[in-house]
Amino acid sequence: MKYLTSAQVRQMFLDFFKEKGHDVEPSASLVPHDDPSLLWINSGVATLKKYFDGRVIPENPRITNAQKSIRTNDIENVGKTARHHTFFEMLGNFSIGDYFKEEAIEWAWEFLTSEKWIGFDKEKLSVTVHPEDDEAYSYWKEKIGIPEERIIRLEGNFWDIGEGPSGPNTEIFYDRGPEYGDQPNDPELYPGGENDRYLEVWNLVFSQFNHNPDGSYTPLPKKNIDTGMGLERMVSVIQNVPTNFETDLFMPIIRATEKISGTEYGSHHEADVSFKVIADHIRTVTFAIGDGALPSNEGRGYVLRRLLRRAVRYAKQIGIDRPFMYELVPVVGDIMVDFYPEVKEKAAFIQKVVKTEEERFHETLNEGLSILEKVIDKAKSEGASTISGSDVFRLYDTYGFPVDLTEEYVEEQGLQVDLDGFEAEMERQRERARTARQQAGSMQVQDEVLGQITVDSTFIGYKQLSTETTIETIVLDKTVADYVGAGQEAKVILKETPFYAESGGQVADKGIIRGANGFAVVSDVQKAPNGQHLHTVIVKEGTLQVNDQVQAIVEETERSGIVKNHTATHLLHRALKDVLGEHVNQAGSLVSEERLRFDFSHFGQVTDEEKEKIERIVNEKIWQAIKVNISTKTLDEAKAIGAMALFGEKYGDIVRVVEVGDYSIELCGGCHVTNTSEIGLFKIVSESGIGAGVRRIEAVTGKEAFLFMAKQLDLLKETAATVKAKNVKDVPVRVEALQQQIRELQRENESLNAKLGNMEAGSLVNEVQKIEGVPVLAKAISGADMDGLRSIVDKLKQEIPSVVIVLGTASEGKVNIVAGVTKDLINKGYHAGKLVKEVATRCGGGGGGRPDMAQAGGKQPEKLQDALSFVYEYVKSIS
């Protein structure tokens, strides 16, 4: 067997299937952009679901890819086993209703055994098949020539992830030799068993059934092939190393980590686990951030945060106590540069994100210790000897606090950890993840009606908004029909259409279809599986029939607003990169008649100054009256002139390029103005964060921008009248004068409050009672706000050397409470924060604070007196 690098194996796989007539599908972003059911792209087939479920008919039914993927369901095993990973590459070949079992099996065998390709020894390969799949069994035995003893029937060889395509599968195993297992009594030592000797290198799935919503299975109209070969596992076999981590995909990362830690890989098992965790997790984090994900407390951002924190925790075990993961990002970029050059291009931004997150986690470890101390204090106060599993899990899951550290600290305090309870919480989390995967993985059941429509339909709406055309197809109630009558809604395909189908963020055109026998309103336009524009129409008068000659007319005013906003979106995208940095990528967009919405990746907030600069740049480009040039080019030609490809989009060999002078060049299939001057005006309406590392700008152009600014001016005029400014330009001066008056009144008020507080404190000194020998003052007073209460409590503590004080005031349906405890009584166990919390709870509120001073609020003023009486009970309980 010849030695191959991982890059060679990947390219060899794609080249092989390209020779077999497959189109090479580029590796899609890890962040799904058209599949809300998925947190991450988690397999090679995940990006092809639209083909398998019939929503889209591919140009070529034969597809191959090398797809980067993320799975985190077995994160606890990563580093501890030979082949568990959170990030991996899946090589696959797929047939959408074209070839089936015979070709899939024959080509797999050729690729694995031919000296031109991998060149495995045929005698080292075994296969498994489903017990009822006699067809596959026969192919392996009769055509390929594998002896019966190396063809194993296994019940588990059936691929089914819920509703949608499913079917039997066959797996190919490579025998690595007796050094990886040679115990004749081992019940798992066989291809398909749990062992390190027989490694699965390829899984061929024969999708021949639909798993229907009612649980039944019916044959698919078109049978499909879906195969998967894990690159990391395959390379470990070819490079003849014990685990995936010794391959050239991981070892450069491990060597770089050795230099940082001063510890040697292979020196002892515990250290090796740390090296493996770090190497795996930095690959995942690097690629995910490169594809637009950012650390956060929810969704995929939470996954990144958890992976980074897990790696940092393991790094401590090999002597690394500082941020370091960011230093490994360029190493990952160098390893993967042949197939994923974008990682190296984005390395600086990825490093910035990783370093910031590492620094935060080092602070979080300290925060976790603080939380743990409170948990321990609570357990002791309740007389418990064990820290609950739920508390341990919360520390681990929310704060990233290691369980072993929790155990260590807890044992130092003479307590124990409920590890069984912790494991139960972990299992509940795993079950939630399993359920989510099952729900996310299911594909839609194939809908054959639209997929079978193959009539030609041409979009002519770039240059004209109306045309004489013919009705080619009518779909009524999911059935192909000859006509549709008044009051009915149907889907219509026209021979030529000026109506734009919703895509790329641009909304569909609206308008009318008028014929000799009736007319209909077009309310929506989507793309059918075979690419035709599918018009949703409601017939208002008469009937529309197949083969009718009709006039299709787009609503011109609406399209005019759309094109202005679409070109403005391109200008905005470029301006964002110019002002915020090249890391900015489109994360979503909406282009309608009234407004545009643009979501983009950005790590941090956008300042007012940055927003003003972005807005100014866009308007300058509008006022420069730049010509917009639209052309078609090959993808390579477009890239050569610097065309910006949108994040997560798929492009063919021929692409449409929209150039706004030399300022903005993007690949785009949408509708645009011919000159930027047509946009007129651009105004940002709002900017906000909508998720982890994703910001949103909403803006208006042209007439809508004018109306927005006119409305803002009206508000300013109203403000001028309110503050009694002579005209709008005097508003800032007038507001500043009013603010100065307010500040002076506040100072006077504070001075009066201080005097009143001193008087109040003087009168309250005489109301101190002794409870069990402890001076206590619990009193409701009037006329003081929270600041006033604090001032009075401070004054009383100065005048009374030893005292517990709780003062409350009720006003306008709210309660304010302040508690204070002198230092001598704190040493005896009295705590203002705990006391004020108890008092506030009794009048419908909450709060807390330091042992010496704390405040709280409540919502039930009528219960304040009863709540204050609790203070005396509290003092007795401590005494």
Curated annotation (Swiss-Prot):
Pfam families: DHHA1, tRNA-synt_2c, tRNA_SAD
Binding positions for Zn(2+) per the UniProt entry: H566, H570, C668, H672
CDD domains xrefs: AlaRS_core (cd00673)
EC number(s) from the headed UniProt entry: 6.1.1.7
Top-level taxonomic group: Bacteria
Cofactor(s) essential for the protein: Zn(2+)
Biological process, per Gene Ontology: alanyl-tRNA aminoacylation
Alphabetized UniProt keyword annotations: Aminoacyl-tRNA synthetase, ATP-binding, Cytoplasm, Ligase, Metal-binding, Nucleotide-binding, Protein biosynthesis, RNA-binding, tRNA-binding, Zinc
Subcellular locations according to the entry: Cytoplasm
UniProt key word tRNA-binding: yes
Annotated Gene Ontology cellular component terms: cytosol
Reaction(s) this enzyme catalyzes, per UniProt: tRNA(Ala) + L-alanine + ATP = L-alanyl-tRNA(Ala) + AMP + diphosphate
Cofactor binding mode and count: Binds 1 zinc ion per subunit.
GO molecular function, one term: transferase activity
Domain notes: Consists of three domains; the N-terminal catalytic domain, the editing domain and the C-terminal C-Ala domain. The editing domain removes incorrectly charged amino acids, while the C-Ala domain, along with tRNA(Ala), serves as a bridge to cooperatively bring together the editing and aminoacylation centers thus stimulating deacylation of misacylated tRNAs.
Family: Belongs to the class-II aminoacyl-tRNA synthetase family.
Purpose: Catalyzes the attachment of alanine to tRNA(Ala) in a two-step reaction: alanine is first activated by ATP to form Ala-AMP and then transferred to the acceptor end of tRNA(Ala). Also edits incorrectly charged Ser-tRNA(Ala) and Gly-tRNA(Ala) via its editing domain.
NCBIfam families (alphabetical): alaS (TIGR00344)
Protein's name according to its UniProt entry: Alanine--tRNA ligase
Lineage: Bacteria, Bacillati, Bacillota, Bacilli, Bacillales
